[in-house]
Curated annotation (Swiss-Prot):
Taxon lineage: Eukaryota, Viridiplantae, Streptophyta, Embryophyta, Tracheophyta
Taxonomic source organism: Populus euphratica (Euphrates poplar)
Family label: Belongs to the chaperonin (HSP60) family.
GO annotation, cellular component aspect: chloroplast
Protein name per its UniProtKB record: RuBisCO large subunit-binding protein subunit beta, chloroplastic
Subcellular location: Plastid, Chloroplast
Purpose of the protein: This protein binds RuBisCO small and large subunits and is implicated in the assembly of the enzyme oligomer.
Length: 24
């Protein structure tokens, strides 16, 4: 997970990737 304070968009994309991995 991207460190706090980083680009919110990058954090969102990282979370989406985690969710996609969980769905697969």
């Amino acid at each position: 997970v991207v460190a706090a304070g980083a680009n919110p968009v990058l954090i969102t994309r990282d979370l989406v990737n985690v969710l996609e991995d969980a769905i697969r």
